[in-house]
Amino acid sequence: MLRDPGTMWHTVVGQRICETGHLIQTDPFSFTQQGQAWIAQQWLGECAMAVIHHFAGLDGLVLWAAVILAGTFAFLAGRFMRAGLQWPAAAILLVLVIAASSYHFIPRPHLVTILLLTLVTALLCDVEAGRVSMRRLLWLPPLFVLWTNIHGGALGGIATVFLVQMAWLLRGVPEKLGPSEITHLWHRRPAGGETGETPVPQVNPVLIATSLSLCFVAVLVNPYGTALPRVWLSLMHSDLLPRIMIEHAPLRFLSTEGVMILTLAAVYLGLLAATWRRGLRVTWLVPLVWLVLACSRVRHGPLFAVTAAVAIADMLPHSPLPAIFARSGSTLLDPARAAEAVGLRVMAVPALLVALVFGVQTAGIRCPLIGAGWCRLDPSYWPVEATKVLREHLAAQPEDRRVFNDMLFGGYLIYNAPEARVYIDDRCELYRDSGLSRYLELRDHPERIEGLSGNAAPRLALVRSRSQLRRYLEGSPQWSELHRDPTASLFVRKPD
């Protein structure tokens, strides 16, 4: 889980906010953008990470990431079993959902987006099915205030709510005008094969309009005002991000995550097709939107997975599958034996266990898996040894703090070498396409590093040992090698 630089620099941002009592408004970490406007768009999540790190370090961050994920998938498992799936079948389906999401299990604020989108989709399903009152939609605006200040995935959540509620409003128009083929799409027939249709709950346009309006206003309830959603939109429109960051790249269908996502998509689409003739609900179509987004940017894959899981659980009792299982004598899917909803009391034991583990970590007690010091950064992936040499060099020559670095190493240096100033890191909204393009040029044409001058000229270079940059710097008369290991190499520019 500790293979993403965001885990580290997000924590440092939260530490600075907590220590100073002020939000960050300009870049404090790089020498290429120093003093330029930059907002900590995930400030609340970053502060939470800083507090956890203060008490339990990286162990605590991994623990609470696991807690968020465990809570999300336990919630989904509960919905599967309340739909009539018995635990063996629910476990198999849950494993598929986890497999389609696991490549993005990283201790970062985006995990909250996975959890909250799951809850929002479930709420929309419950409202449309009539299981809860439509007044529950008024819970969404305060939820989006919290979500907005934790992670930009709130934009996707609001888009989901907007699409569903607008479809509900549009559904009401043909119903008032009279029967039509469109009307039949928004009704469901009972699964028992009875004729006739049972309409979904009556739409309340005033309540929907109020909920939607407050959700949009909720996005502006943040310390940065309209600047925050503008940053989200700028990241969506970047043409370079898919080239430079794997999580923004299109889904590779033959990759492990691609196969898992497509397998889950096949299950979802097959169930949707089988249930379609019995009636259709708007919320059952939500995963289609996220599937398209996942194909365009792989980072959306977990969001497709959790919305698909919620929709599958909602569709199962209305599909032909219960009758098919009954005819075969199987009880793996039997809505009549659906599990009862559990109360908050069942969470007491897991909560106590989490508190116990966090207490062990906070106390610094060393023991396998749950103790302090168990989580370490992999020196075969991160420049652990090279950074030690870099810090020793900066202690002797602090004026050399401008470091050209591989983009992957930027967040690591921000966390582990705070006295250094990086050339780039993965805060792409700060560097914009122009800065990302310059980095790509230097990466692909290492000789151009000699053209950097003035405040843009690095004094040190920390690059991957198997990169073109390392090979160029090794042969350049302008640079001298200070350290090399299989992971990273450190160079210093020779005096003019």
Question: What is each PLM-predicted segment?
Answer:
Residues V120-R136, Q202, Y268-T275:
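Membrane-interface transmembrane helices that cradle and orient dolichyl/undecaprenyl
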Residues A40-A50, R230-T263:
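Juxtamembrane membrane-water interface segments that cap and precede transmembrane helices
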Residues F325-A395, L408-G410, C428, L440, ...:
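Membrane-proximal, lumen/periplasm-facing interface regions of secretory-pathway glyco-
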Residues V97-S101, R136-G152, L214-V219, L288-A294:
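Membrane-interface alpha helices of multi-pass inner-membrane proteins
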Residues L63-A83:
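Transmembrane-helix motifs of polytopic, lipid-linked glycan transferases
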Residues E392-D433, G454, P458-S465, F491:
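Short periplasmic/luminal acceptor-recognition loop of GT-C membrane glycosyltransferases, typified by
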Residues D126-V145, V206-T210, W284-P287:
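Short hydrophobic alpha-helices at membrane interfaces in multi-pass membrane enzymes
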Residues L76-A99, I114:
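Transmembrane-helix signature of polytopic, membrane-embedded enzymes
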